[in-house]
Amino acid sequence: MFGAPLLNEIIARALVLLVAFPVHEGAHAFVANWLGDPTPRRAGRISWNPLRHLDIVGAILFLYAGIGWAYTPVDPSRLGRRGMAIVSVAGPLANLLTGALFAIPAHFVLTNPSLDRLFGYGQIFPSLGDIMWFMVLYNILLGLFNLIPLPPLDGFSILVGIVPYPWAITLMKLQPYGILIMLGLVFLLPMTGINPVGWVFQAARLLSLRLVAGL
């Protein structure tokens, strides 16, 4: 997953980036605005325009490693714990739905070699099948990965929103350490033989295969 990607894979990820991240962050923004928080609207995030959502460092990391980030500003004081949980779950659900929808054209392209070769082929330019497959895989991966209940992922905000208030207060003490937790999750834990990110990736791959093959 973290090996040096081929050029065709980078190009395919770039195309995915223009879809998966705006879908995810746009869903957060739309739901937050719907629940009464004008912060995303004032920041110009009520949009599917990729340029309004992408973070340059997160985008570059996604192109190289398949994991990146973007950000939608919201005001927790306007949303409350329950509202934050609803806003948080919107992003992953939007990605899972997008991945499932892309599985339909992916199935037809990957089962028809003539369609697969319409766009490009080889190690330089991705084939149409490559693009469709990555659209499914990385939307599913982004959806599942963000459901991990650790800060700063969406799953953590969902967890904080559904547990009893005293538990939520205790959990929220972890928020300042979100970056350190992510570094440990992605880079340190795998050195011990425990690789949650790898498990999520394998689950995403299996689910994507079933979606594409099962149509």
Predicted features, each with a name:
Residues 1-215:
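Hydrophobic transmembrane alpha-helices and their immediate loop junctions
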